[in-house]
Amino acid sequence: MSPRTFEEQTECIVNALLTDFLGPAWEVGNRTLQCEDESDSGEVSSFDVAIIAGRLRMLGDKFNGELEASAKNVIAETIRGQAGIVLQNTVKSLSNAWCAQDSSLAYERAFLAVSVKLLEHVARMAPEVARQVVRPITNMINGNTAIREYIQGQGGWENLEG
């Protein structure tokens, strides 16, 4: 069954990204969401988590800012149980800085790119902590009205370009 809500889709996508970044040796999460691309009626849905995750990785690859210090800070705060606020502030700050350098860049695209790239850095630097960052990243995307409206304005996750 395909994820129905925006929130479920976001969770599937962030988990798929983490699986990509960590590789098959790591199990992701303790909650299994159905992320297949078939609906209850047997119709194939346009929601393909692998394609969407790939597009987001391409988007993230466009960000070439320095993330080492930010990732270390997110890792440290995640270990202390404070991932949510630090993650939001870090992504917001890096996204704003990137947009200031490139006036043609939509803030929402920068936000998504930085989120993906930061998750990739955390996964590479501290794989055991990366799983704890999935929920805060998912909540950050789901809870940001501007990001949500941007994605829905594109026609949903499945129409987001990399």
UniProtKB/Swiss-Prot annotation:
Keyword Lipid biosynthesis assigned to the entry: answer is no
According to its UniProt entry, the protein's GO biological process terms are:
apoptotic process; regulation of apoptotic process
The name this protein goes by in its record = Bcl-2-like protein 15
**Top-level taxonomic group:** Eukaryota
Q: Keywords, A to Z?
A: Apoptosis
Q: Which residues form a coiled coil?
A: none
Q: Give me the Gene Ontology terms describing cellular component.
A: cytosol; nucleus
